[in-house]
Design a protein with these regions (language model features):
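Short histidine-centered loop motifs in beta-beta connectors
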Residues: 56-58, 62-63, 95-124
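Exoplasmic/lumenal beta-rich domain surfaces
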Residues: 84, 100, 108, 216-263
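Bacterial N-terminal signal peptides
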Residues: 9-19
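A glycine-anchored, Pro-Gly-centered beta-turn/N-cap motif
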Residues: 196, 260, 265-269
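A structural signal for beta-strand boundary/capping segments at domain termini and interdomain linkers
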Residues: 100, 280-284
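Surface-exposed, glycine-biased beta-strand/turn segments
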Residues: 20-89, 94, 122-123, 132, ...
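Bacterial N-terminal signal peptides that target proteins for export
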Residues: 1-9
Length: 292
């Protein structure tokens, strides 16, 4: 039977039932290195900030840790921002540390075989095989989400799960400055700017997203955007920098990623840009610019 659930509201209603404890989690699939994903948490997916990790290959799906089965769903569409697309056959598990984990785009028959009559799961216990039941119609890819009930936010699985041995190489290319009127300037070709508020963009990687981006002026941090959690306010998802950045701010089109905002004042300044991945590896660039 098909039903529609506002999963985030359901999750929030369970907050009082669980206490906060230390936790350790395991990956829901065996392969979690750099080629194991189609899309990172925080990426631009159909004009939204993704709250999921999307895996690239079919595989067995396992429970990330001990928990109680909250919902088993078949071809369910949810209209909340945290779950904006068809989840397909999905299993949602509630854990004793104010987290819920969501395993979506599963094979319906294997869901029935593995969890239909169960009330709880042990860490590493098989939930199902991946399927083609969700929005990813062409591949059997797991869509995996973690929601923190205390923070009312989606948590990047990469900051909770065991660290991978390698990550997709994240490069800094195509640096652009955008003024308040929306005009873009290629920083390689423009070294002189009128004073004012500017956004700094780079060319977007279509799969990977950084862990953190930092913008400095003369060595002073003026903005820093973290890709560790996605919050929700007034029906809109956002990442936190010096302010709350929505999808339209972070990804104004399919090709750009926001690194941060800055106020340029008259004089000669050094603009510093840093991106950091989940292994702590950083890429840095600096530019000397003149402002009038």
């Amino acid at each position: 039977m098909k039903k529609t659930f506002n999963l985030f509201i359901i999750a929030l209603s369970l907050m009082v039932a669980f206490s906060t404890t230390a936790f350790a989690v395991e990956w829901p699939q065996e392969d979690f290195n750099n080629d194991a994903f189609n899309s990172y948490f925080g990426q631009n997916v159909s004009g939204r900030i993704s709250t999921s990790l999307v895996f690239s290959d079919p595989a067995e799906v396992k429970a990330m840790k001990d928990g109680k089965i909250l919902i088993v769903m078949a071809d369910v569409s949810d209209d909340s921002e945290f779950f904006p697309s068809t989840l397909g056959n999905s299993v949602i598990v509630c854990h004793d540390d104010d987290l819920i984990s969501v395993y979506a785009n599963l094979d319906g028959e294997s869901v029935q075989e593995n969890v239909e009559n169960k009330k709880s799961l042990k860490e590493g216990e098989i939930i199902a095989e991946t399927g083609n039941s969700g929005w990813q119609e062409t591949r059997s890819n797991l869509e995996f989400q973690i929601i923190d009930l205390q923070k009312s936010a989606a948590i990047n699985p990469k900051i909770l799960l065991p660290r991978a041995e390698n990550e997709i190489e994240f490069t800094m290319t195509g640096i652009m400055l955008q003024n308040k009127d929306g005009k873009l300037f290629d920083i390689r070709e423009n070294k002189v700017y009128p004073s004012g508020l500017y956004k700094v963009f780079q060319t977007r990687n279509k799969i990977a997203a950084p862990y953190k981006t930092t913008v400095t002026i003369n060595g002073v941090v003026v903005d820093e955007i973290a890709f560790d959690t996605v919050g929700q306010e007034n029906g809109k998802l956002y990442l936190i920098g010096k302010k709350k950045y929505e999808s339209k701010d972070l990804y104004p089109d399919e090709n750009l990623l926001l690194l941060g905002e800055m106020m340029l004042t008259p004089g000669r300044s050094t603009l510093g840009l840093t991106v950091q991945n989940y292994l702590g590896k950083i890429k840095q660039q600096s530019y000397v610019i003149s402002i009038y």
